[in-house]
Amino acid sequence: MSQDFVEIAKIGATYKLDGELNLYPLASSIETLLSYGDWYIQLPANSAWQPLKDESVLRRADKLYIKLASVNDVETAKKYVNSLIGVPKEALPKVGNDEAYFTDLIGCTIVNTANDSFGKVIGIIETGANEVLVCKKDSDEYLIPYVKQYIVSEDLDLKKIVVDWEYDY
């Protein structure tokens, strides 16, 4: 049985000659990122998640860096650039009613109350005021605010969201 993982960070360019790498959180805060237990890594050329052992996460001002145990020079570190850091999905805190992790919304089919299809959710834009679902159907793209006012129902097990929205909004 394969385990589901949620991406929590992305490794960026090398930072120091000893193999430190920039670390970019995908979580809402650095504290949230650091609160997760065991981390896993997915290399750019490999879809398998591997456990990270003895990594060090360094915080300098408002930036994060990662030092992998087996990496001691820039050339070795370059192999890890653009890798993803993840945690098992079951390690995430349970969400409350009317809440969902963004990762659970990606891939959901979107239809309106008239059963017109808006395709699938391919991304989410955070605007500050609210989130916006980016939906794609064929070559068309639709932006639908992810707010209670427009969400009629959500079944994440069936990957289906019904919205009170029209094509011409």
From Swiss-Prot:
PANTHER family: RIBOSOME MATURATION FACTOR RIMM. Binds ribosomal protein uS19. Keywords: Chaperone, Cytoplasm, Ribosome biogenesis, rRNA processing. Belongs to the RimM family. It is found in: Cytoplasm. Its main location: cytoplasm. GO terms for biological process: ribosomal small subunit biogenesis; rRNA processing. This is Ribosome maturation factor RimM.
